[in-house]
From Swiss-Prot:
It is a peripheral membrane protein. Gene3D superfamilies: 2.40.30.20, ATP synthase alpha/beta chain, C-terminal domain (1.20.150.20), P-loop containing nucleotide triphosphate hydrolases (3.40.50.300). This is ATP synthase subunit alpha. Signal peptide: none annotated.
Amino acid sequence: MQQLNPSEISEIIKGRIEKLDVSSQARNEGTVVSVSDGIVRIHGLADVMYGEMIEFPGSVFGMALNLEQDSVGAVVLGDYTSLAEGMSAKCTGRILEVPVGKELLGRVVDALGNPIDGKGPLNNTETDAVEKVAPGVIWRKSVDQPVQTGYKSVDAMIPVGRGQRELIIGDRQIGKTAMAVDAIINQKNSGIFCVYVAVGQKQSTIANVVRKLEEAGALANTIVVAASASESAALQFLAPYAGCTMGEFFRDRGEDALIVYDDLSKQAVAYRQISLLLRRPPGREAYPGDVFYLHSRLLERASRVSEEYVEKFTNGAVTGKTGSLTALPIIETQAGDVSAFVPTNVISITDGQIFLESAMFNAGIRPAVNAGVSVSRVGGAAQTKIIKKLSGGIRTALAQYRELAAFAQFASDLDEATRKQLEHGQRVTELMKQKQYAPMSIADMALSLYAAERGFLTDVEVAKVGSFEQALIAYFNRDHAELMAKINVKGDFNDEIDAGMKAGIEKFKATQTW
């Protein structure tokens, strides 16, 4: 019997090992222990980052949100029905990124940046992180340029500036989306790029908005990010951040952008759902403790950045230009309750709010802007000069009219001054009415405000104020086109414009053609 030589055996094994061709690959892999309602628990994953992408079999991805002692809680991005217990889960070492760039303009994409409009794939290769840190104090610049919404009531009383966060708040079906969509339509020739983020909306509503933008010719400079009511809570939670990243692309390159979040109440509800499924402790109204941070870290990214920031970001490719991202978040209230948890949070984060009131809407005053409660904290410095000059008495007239109208219900005989004030208030209220999808130019708006401010409406019947305004604007655009063009270009108010407007209105009133 042949005797085995241990040294010989070890030499053979060593030789075999050396010849073995195995590419070494360090893998951080775990096992799925439970799958339910879009939440996956994974055991055995080490060194996972918060917010890291986790890959499951079949190219399904998740996002790590709960890092616990012996397991990781992740939310699945997309369809989770193919996942089952015992499957493997791998760390990717990447955080979630979405496509950015001008190629997205005119397209409808989902929360992950995948096109859903049937117009073919996106041609860009550039991506950016969904979660980003907002620019610091040093890189910011004060808001001093206007964003014209095209609404008299907003641009005159609650002006919005580039880089501002202005909240639109009100009950359901009161014209919040209409106001935001009109603001986007008004930007089609302003050079401001727009992003419309729909969160938890009906697909028919989103399709209607896209159709209106297309009809108005504003879709070409707008990106629509849609996370409809049928999408998972994870995608509804991520959509605003994805839209913000797409808007920041323009801001960081010295351009101006406007983003509408429609609406953040539904995003908070989606985040609450995710948090409760992840077994996080609930707080007030069952929202998690960090629901304020959910919105503050999103809205702080809307800002006006300095020339130095843009130059540093573009490595000197763009110089001498500031960039801005203006946010119009929308919040839906229940029966006008602005003291609920999410509304108070967002009011405290933003630079002002446009409050829409049900009673005014039902009374036919549309847009139903309550001038007494609405405020713009920084927009005054950005207001167009001519609008600022002519709108001074409008807010006061409306506030006094509200007060006197309530008082007049109880008083039988009113003195002459009070009666005149009430009549003026009625005419101004009538003048502030505006049709949907009909944003006004600066010159048209200035003309309306001039007529009210200088008392040219005093002898016009309240019921005919609207037709008077339309006829006056048509007359000026036809017979005084040069003056209107000058106002639209410069936005200044001087003696020449004052005299031109006064003479034109007097001439128009003499015709009695309204």
